[in-house]
Amino acid sequence: MMRNWLWLLISVASAAAAEPPPRIELTFTLTRNGSTMAEVTELLQYAAGNYQLTETWKGKGFYALLGSARRQSIGTIENGVLRPREFFDERSGRDTARAWFDWKAQTLTMQYKGTRGVEPLPPNAQDRLSFLFALSLLPGSKSDSVSYSIADGKGLSRHTYKLVGRERIRTPVGEFDTVKAARQGDDRETAEVWLAPQYSYIPIRLLVVDKDGKRMEQLPTRISQ
């Protein structure tokens, strides 16, 4: 019964969550066990049902030796469902990983290190970048959980997330009332995402803790629209 009431409260509070902002840019600090690893910038652009999500990484301190990274996801949002069309992940010193989603033909094409493979499009397919954006649509949907088949250009993994409550959090750019989602069914690590209603439920904090206790956390340092 309490779970049903929790879901009802989240649903009522997020009735307008399905429409992303036309533009929002967030800069994060990524830390590992409290030490700064990188500055991460995420830029979302959305118009007429089409989105483009671009993420860039710049290593800090010792991690600057690892260079930089850039990922991009392009696709559509139809009836509250996010459908990526193209994805790439390019990093210093590595081959670029790519994925193409053909929703009409129901095929997924992935390419890495010169090898390209085609396979049937799995259920609720997302890419490594788009699935976090897709989570922002969950509070406005008819369910409190969702499972994604996530492609990164090299392979597929299955992730299930569930809305677990509301929480007020403190960040370097202020305090926010959030809806919290947690990954389910993974014994290797815990993953939690805090979605900000103030910004159309875009993820504003991420925390991953592996089985050895290593903490990877991402917190915002700048938000602009």
Task: Place the predicted regions along the sequence by residue.
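Intrinsically disordered, low-complexity regions enriched in Ser/Pro/Gly/Gln/His and often acidic
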Residues: 1-2, 50
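Alpha-helical transmembrane segments and their juxtamembrane interfaces
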Residues: 2, 13-14, 212
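Sec-dependent signal peptide recognition
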Residues: 2-8
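Hydrophobic h-region of N-terminal signal peptides that target proteins for export
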Residues: 9-18
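Acidic, serine/threonine-rich low-complexity disordered tracts
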Residues: 19-103, 137-225
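Hydrophobic, well-structured mid-protein blocks that either form specific transmembrane helices
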Residues: 93-136
